[in-house]
Amino acid sequence: MGQSLHALLRDVGLELPAGLADPQLTSITSDSRLVGEGSLFLGLPGERFDGGRFWRQALEAGAAAAVIGPSAAQELPPAADQPVLVLREPVARSIGELAASYWGHPCRRMALIGVTGTNGKTTTTHLIEHLAVRVGQPTALFGTLVNRWPGYSITATHTTSVADRLQAQLAEAASAGSQLAAMEVSSHALVQERVAGCRFAGAVFTNLTQDHLDYHGTMESYYEAKARLFTAPLLDGDGPSAVVNGDDPWGSRLAEQLGGRCWRSSLGDPQAELQMVDLEMTGQGVRGRLLSPAGSGAFCSPLLGRFNLMNLLQAVGVLLQRGLPLAPLLEAVGSFRGVPGRMERVVVNGAESAALPTVLVDYAHTPDGLENALAASRPFTDGRLVCVFGCGGDRDRGKRPQMAAIAARLADRVVVTSDNPRTEDPDQIIADVVAGMPSGTDLSVERDRATAIAEAIADASAADLVLIAGKGHEDYQILGTEKVHFDDREEAEQALRQRQ
């Protein structure tokens, strides 16, 4: 961007060490392997190791300077004449601000909307993108599945990228003409300051249910992480700029904290600013009326499930806060067909068949997500509801018996299998799940996920519905430390073909 080191440091309020040279910077990066002549190396502290420890390698590779944290400086103290700036804590926040400044503060050039919550982030951000584009506003999307903007698209590797890469992507999106951007913001990203340097014009809280307690420890800590998105300097301003799920107990708490700065969304509270009424569920989706401070109107959506109504309500609501017109937004709702791996129907040769069971693949991997997916599936079967699921290894063990109890309560038949066991013993994970099943559950256990899917579909009648939960869009399994190709949709389609 042609910025000098001194100008960059001054822009974010950092003190200049005496004698520090003022070169023109050619790039910034937190990856020492990407350093070139004139780069600024950002020594980003991480969970497993401190990237600041690589400052020497960065300088040897031609970096003009390096910024590191106190722990890296203590471990490998730089000499007084070396161009190394030691930051005060929180280091990651300063690095995010540096990245935003280097890339010209991209959030000042387009309106950034952040979506956080346990479930619903992906569908809600995709809805925001779809609706905004349909009403003529070029929009970028950052999330679990893909990062894209006008003229560019790439499969995402993380829900929220590290700060320097994120700011570079935001700058590219703004330069490509994006007027708005929808971003999934994970709790990990908020704790690790990956979105430092961002300024959000709007924010959405979808819900909070048990997940990631292996990382956060308690639900209170998990909530506090999510709530960071709704505080300055990330989200600021006097008027309504947030949409919060008022039907969620944690959302109700957040709404009370935010007061007039948020609109509450609800499917049952007549006092909420955003509501849906006169709902009619059909085999083709749902129709009803949306009520908002900007007016009301009828809508028709092909999305399945009550939980998707909340996603839709919140997406429309946050765009209304941005001043987009209600009528065109509601018209655009009907053309949104959903997100890959979210209540996605698997068919053979692109066509449904009355001779085959209905098969849905969903990313549900939390207790709340599984309950929502099963509840949404029930109206679409005249036969049995069969649930195939497992729980990930090296993750929150407390949700395993909870998911088991939900599956046993809402499904007619349950098949427990593997789901990214990672370095845990798959049989022990399955045992943890089965321990939560009440006696009398119609239960099968099959460690091999492909076999479990094939047998569940082979055993199902044409009137049954088979829900394959947990992986959704993912096209891999993590076995030990190895990632191997695996796609629930491919396995399900193959099993359906065997039925023809």
UniProtKB/Swiss-Prot annotation:
Binding residues for UDP-N-acetyl-alpha-D-muramoyl-L-alanyl-D-glutamate: S32, T159, T160, S186, Q192, R194
Reaction(s) catalysed by this chain's protein: UDP-N-acetyl-alpha-D-muramoyl-L-alanyl-D-glutamate + meso-2,6-diaminopimelate + ATP = UDP-N-acetyl-alpha-D-muramoyl-L-alanyl-gamma-D-glutamyl-meso-2,6-diaminopimelate + ADP + phosphate + H(+)
Binding-site residues, meso-2,6-diaminopimelate: R395, D419, N420, P421, R422, G470, E474
EC nos: 6.3.2.13
GO molecular function: ATP binding; magnesium ion binding; UDP-N-acetylmuramoylalanyl-D-glutamate-2,6-diaminopimelate ligase activity
Modified residues (N6-carboxylysine): K226
Annotated Gene Ontology cellular component terms: cytoplasm
Localization of this protein: Cytoplasm
Binding site for ATP: G117, T118, N119, G120, K121, T122, T123
Modification comment: Carboxylation is probably crucial for Mg(2+) binding and, consequently, for the gamma-phosphate positioning of ATP.
Names of required cofactors: Mg(2+)
GO biological process: cell division; cell wall organization; peptidoglycan biosynthetic process; regulation of cell shape
SUPFAM superfamilies named among the record's database cross-references: MurD-like peptide ligases, catalytic domain, MurD-like peptide ligases, peptide-binding domain, MurE/MurF N-terminal domain
Motif (Meso-diaminopimelate recognition motif) on chain: 419-422
Similarity-based family: Belongs to the MurCDEF family. MurE subfamily.
PANTHER family per UniProt: MUR LIGASE FAMILY MEMBER, UDP-N-ACETYLMURAMOYL-L-ALANYL-D-GLUTAMATE--2,6-DIAMINOPIMELATE LIGASE MURE HOMOLOG, CHLOROPLASTIC
Function: Catalyzes the addition of meso-diaminopimelic acid to the nucleotide precursor UDP-N-acetylmuramoyl-L-alanyl-D-glutamate (UMAG) in the biosynthesis of bacterial cell-wall peptidoglycan.
Protein name: UDP-N-acetylmuramoyl-L-alanyl-D-glutamate--2,6-diaminopimelate ligase
Organism of this sequence: Parasynechococcus marenigrum (strain WH8102)
Organism lineage: Bacteria, Bacillati, Cyanobacteriota, Cyanophyceae, Synechococcales
